[in-house]
């Protein structure tokens, strides 16, 4: 055990998705509350915590490299997060790691920190910890995690083996956190989980309470309540359950942002079956048409995988045909990558890397054309934009159709009389495949 006499300092690195970022924020909030100083450099820290990602092989490699860097520069390292669920894999590469915990093991992480770097007796930081906790996002937006884990067993994914089955947070707790965020100046709440539309399924949508008011534990009920906070609410990771239809009217009424992040993964019924995903493409196209009729402003984001084991040229052509018909606004595409422990590894007919690359290029070329056409439709229109950055050359923001980090931006060249978090009306003057340019009205 270290004999720490100065103010203890903890180095911290957070890797992976927004869900992991929320876990990091929770750990950092506890550390700050207990009086630890969190520092950006490893060399003068008493210990380093690495919150890892283990979703795909490249993420595993990045996590292992970050652990190695922390060991080289500091020597005392605790590992947590998704890759922490595979302790043997970490120990094989980095046997000198002090402790390893799995994802959302907040208490264990803190116990290990206390063991190696005891808590300070005097806490000069307690009054500096904001009520909403430590946030790693800009002040004007924040991620709101509503559940942990997932009940699906998609064959390309190992999240359930790392994070377990679905566990929904009590709706009262979620809404209390959202209220604290808004009170602290947050203008945009990004609702996240492994499976947002499954919120409440594990507790059979039981009645919860917030400020003494009863409400159902469900995605639709949660959206209704969040809409009362008067800020932008954006839904991510929405599995295409039938009840997703029920949130579209809320978007049409302006209660939550007309934005749906709904990972569809493929469009060939045969490949979807191999993935253990919903397989009715015609039904999905009909739903998209219906959603747009109800809410013409709706932005649809999705992600797809090309080169999944067994994918033929015919299967891939079905995917391209789907893109042409669905005309989705925002699309991400991944080349299938084997993940240790995933069921898809056992499937026959693995697709050669050069074929994956060729299909990915064709996919992206088509979707870029669709995206450019969709954005061109906005030229000449007025839209609302939330400002993210301002410098001497102007401002950069996002429209209601743009989530942070993953979507496009709106450039306001020469506009310096705004600040991050401002929501301004903008006339769109130009567009390319991903971004817009405009002037404040």
Swiss-Prot record:
Residues recorded as binding [4Fe-4S] cluster 1, renumbered to this chain, are: 17, 53, 82
Which residues belong to any copy of the Radical SAM core domain? 136-373
Task: Give binding positions for [4Fe-4S] cluster 2.
Answer: 150, 154, 157
Q: What does this protein's record comment on cofactor binding?
A: Binds 2 [4Fe-4S] clusters. One cluster is coordinated with 3 cysteines and an exchangeable S-adenosyl-L-methionine.
Question: Major place of localization?
Answer: cytoplasm
Residues in TRAM domain copies? 376-441
Among Gene3D superfamilies, the record links this protein to: Methylthiotransferase, N-terminal domain (3.40.50.12160), Nucleic acid-binding proteins (2.40.50.140), tm_1862 like domain (3.80.30.20)
Which first-to-last residue range defines the signal peptide? none
Cofactor(s) the record lists: [4Fe-4S] cluster
* Pfam families in alphabetical order: Radical_SAM (PF04055), TRAM_2 (PF18693), UPF0004 (PF00919)
The entry's cellular-component GO terms read: cytosol
What the entry lists under PANTHER family is as follows: RIBOSOMAL PROTEIN S12 METHYLTHIOTRANSFERASE RIMO (PTHR43837), RIBOSOMAL PROTEIN US12 METHYLTHIOTRANSFERASE RIMO (PTHR43837:SF1)
NCBIfam families with a match to the protein in the record: 30S ribosomal protein S12 methylthiotransferase RimO (TIGR01125), MiaB/RimO family radical SAM methylthiotransferase (TIGR00089)
Family that this chain belongs to:
Belongs to the methylthiotransferase family. RimO subfamily.
Q: What is this protein called?
A: Ribosomal protein uS12 methylthiotransferase RimO
Q: Which organism is it from?
A: Salmonella typhi
The organism's lineage is: Bacteria, Pseudomonadati, Pseudomonadota, Gammaproteobacteria, Enterobacterales
